[in-house]
Amino acid sequence: MNSKQIDVMVADASHEIYVDKILNTIKEAAKVRGTGIAERTHEYLATKIKEGKAIIALDGDEFAGFTYIESWGNKTYVATSGLIVHPKYRGLGLSKRIKAASFRLARLRWPKAKLFSLTSGGAVMKMNTELGYVPVTFNELTDDEAFWKGCEACTNHEILVSKDRKFCICTAMLYDPAKHADDTI
């Protein structure tokens, strides 16, 4: 199978039918990896999809991958979150296509916002680095309490709290558009 045969697009209301499959894929990946992935509700992901704040990958009508975008601090910070590829489609470079699409979407919708990503996975760190993200400490991220509340759904939340929100199992990575003025979207 070739990743190019899989359609990667901005999700819309017609893709809401995939939410349960997305949630199950994320849950299973968290079990296999043994690391924290913050759980989200059906309603939360459905809203992201309906608002056009998500990227979905489909092989015909079959779910292949997903990610969504969240904005914080009055849209001064934007996170690309929940990147997942169904096991059947792993190893094809699909996650890189999904990540690049979410990066473009975030840059188009919020061109001056700082983009950040939290990850414990080497592959995502590599993709982020290729896009221009750099590792930062957590205190360089948004101070928006709604963002930090979302971390409560992660199995590693106690570590984050015990370190006064400065460190966690995840690596925080930041893309500052002010430092990439010559980059095109």
Residue ranges and their predicted role:
Residues 16-27, 31-38, 164-180:
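Amide-forming acyltransferase catalytic core, primarily the GNAT-like/NAT-type
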Residues 2-22:
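A short beta-loop-alpha structural element at the N-terminal edge
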Residues 1-3, 107-185:
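Terminal substrate-recognition subdomain of acyl/acetyltransferases
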Residues 85, 91-106:
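Conserved acetyl-CoA-binding loop-helix of GNAT-fold acetyltransferases
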Residues 23-87:
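A conserved beta-strand-loop-helix scaffold within acyl/acetyltransferase catalytic domains
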